[in-house]
Structure formats: C-alpha cells, structure tokens
Curated annotation (Swiss-Prot):
Swiss-Prot/TrEMBL keywords: Amino-acid biosynthesis, ATP-binding, Cytoplasm, Histidine biosynthesis, Hydrolase, Nucleotide-binding
This protein's pathway: Amino-acid biosynthesis; L-histidine biosynthesis; L-histidine from 5-phospho-alpha-D-ribose 1-diphosphate: step 2/9
EC number(s) recorded for this UniProt protein: 3.6.1.31
Designated name of the protein: Phosphoribosyl-ATP pyrophosphatase
Subcellular location: Cytoplasm
Gene: hisE
Length: 105
C-alpha cells in the first residue's frame, strides 16, 4: 500500500470523527464545496512556489495539494483507486490523442 492509500484511508476514517478533534473531520464537515475551495487554495499556493522556484516550499505545498485532493475526493465519495484506474487507462496514450477522444460538450 502506498502512502497515498494510507492517507486516503486515514481521511476516510476521519469522516465520522468529531470536528473539534480532527482538522480532516472539520474540513469534511464543512461539505464538498469547502473541501474543493481549500484544494484550489492549496493548488494556487503550489503554483506560486513553482513560479518562484523555491523547491522546498513547492515540496511542502505539493504535499498539501495531495492531502486536500484526497479530502476533496472523500467529500464526494470518490475513491483514490478510481482516479488511479483512470490514470492507468490513459497510460501509454498520447495526451493529445486522449484529449481528442474525449466526448465534446
């Protein structure tokens, strides 16, 4: 099991936890929209560090992005394995060809 699977399992376990005792539970209790908003904030912070070229801060923000992505998935009951299966499906395809094959609209 990977660290991402371990983290996803921990997040899933915190769904029913007391929001006063867990940051993850507190975030999940605010609903999927807030989880998505927080993911977006963290993604922007990672972008800023990437542009600045600060490797250490980018690594830290990257970890935040991954955590908040997993929280956002959990808030919508989407399993990490579903996302990984989609990546596996796309593996070996040209990104251009994959994008062109997506349904329009």
């Amino acid at each position: 099991m990977s660290i991402l699977h371990d983290l996803a399992a921990t997040i899933e376990a915190r769904k029913g936890a007391d929001p006063d005792s867990s940051w993850t539970a507190k975030l999940l209790a605010k609903g999927p929209e807030k989880c998505a908003e927080k993911f977006g904030e963290e993604a922007i912070e990672a972008i800023i560090e990437a542009v600045k070229g600060d490797r250490a801060k980018l690594v830290s923000e990257g970890a935040d992005v991954l955590y908040h992505f997993l929280v956002m998935l959990a808030a919508r009951d989407v399993a990490l394995d579903d996302v990984l299966a989609e990546l596996a499906h796309r593996q070996g395809q040209s990104g251009i060809a994959e994008k062109a094959a997506r349904p329009k609209g």
